Amino acid sequence: MTKITNDLFLKAARKEQVDRIPVWYMRQAGRSQPEYRKLKEKYSLFEITHQPEICAYVTKLPVDQYGVDAAILYKDIMTPLPGMGVDVEIKSGIGPVIHNPIRSFQDVEKLTMFKPEIEVPYVLDTIKLLADDMLDVPLIGFAGAPFTLASYMIEGGPSKNYHQTKSFMYREPEVWAILMEKLGRMTANYLIAQINAGASAVQLFDSWVGALSRADYAEYIRPVIEMIVREVKAVHPTTPIIMQAVGASHLLAEWETMPLDVVGVDWRETITSARKKVPTKAIQGNLDPSTLLAPEKCLKEANRILQEGVLEPGYIFNLGHGVFPEVPPEMLKKLTNYIHERSEILLKKDDIK
């Protein structure tokens, strides 16, 4: 395995002292990079993710080009679902479309057991390739969390309100619990397999869970998240686990009492406020990705965020959501350099101004 010479991200995830703030970006791989767009002219997303050499190349690009302190595996949260019998298609301009949406207990019953080594060997081969030969920074593996996966599976695709998902959850609580159990087992096995293959940390993406109240989260979702985290930690107790959601500030207190290591927040929550709600966790975030299209505003916001981030150990600079395709790659490089240089100055100061 290649030696990790830049461990800033891992130190921050463990709430250790660092000499500069680590930075990486959700959806940093692909998206706006010209090299990626050339690949997309020749290969589909499916083809890229199923070819370890190409997928590893795309994953490594932002490390080389932007100088970020961690790589995140280039995959889609839908990747494991076909291995459970879900007929999913990624449609350009739409996103994931499920051709056999869940409508009943019978549909949930049909979901099969997921074995990562059999169903997604190309994911594990990509990780091994990156960890063994290509990276000197930590590699972050990831999985979609059960609520977000279930919302696609029930709605049949992206949704603005999740009415079908929530009504199914309320109307069929016992069936919902079975669905969560199946998705939870899959997610735990998937994350464990990624760490076994060489991932240094893993992130749970629960993009849409902010649509739930805290009470509903505690009743319908928390048990399965606790199960996932518990199972991963039982096998890999020292591997950092990150929880990332959007519009979910009201759920921070739920995550404080779970054995998570890092909690990601978006621009609706300040770093200082988040720390008060999750004092034992490292914080990741929280620049609004829209500011990347307004360079002056972007750096001003980054400075404001950094001034809060450096006040305590355990801070990782990131976005509150993923990079937009319209973002110029040079802006991400400029921002990365700024975060490194500015945070190094701030961390040396006794009085932050």
Curated annotation (Swiss-Prot):
Xref: CDD domains: URO-D (cd00717)
Annotated keywords: Cytoplasm, Decarboxylase, Lyase, Porphyrin biosynthesis
Catalysed transformations (reactions): uroporphyrinogen III + 4 H(+) = coproporphyrinogen III + 4 CO2
Site (Transition state stabilizer): residue numbering on this chain: 76
Entry's family note: Belongs to the uroporphyrinogen decarboxylase family.
Function: Catalyzes the decarboxylation of four acetate groups of uroporphyrinogen-III to yield coproporphyrinogen-III.
Protein name per UniProt: Uroporphyrinogen decarboxylase
Gene (UniProt): hemE
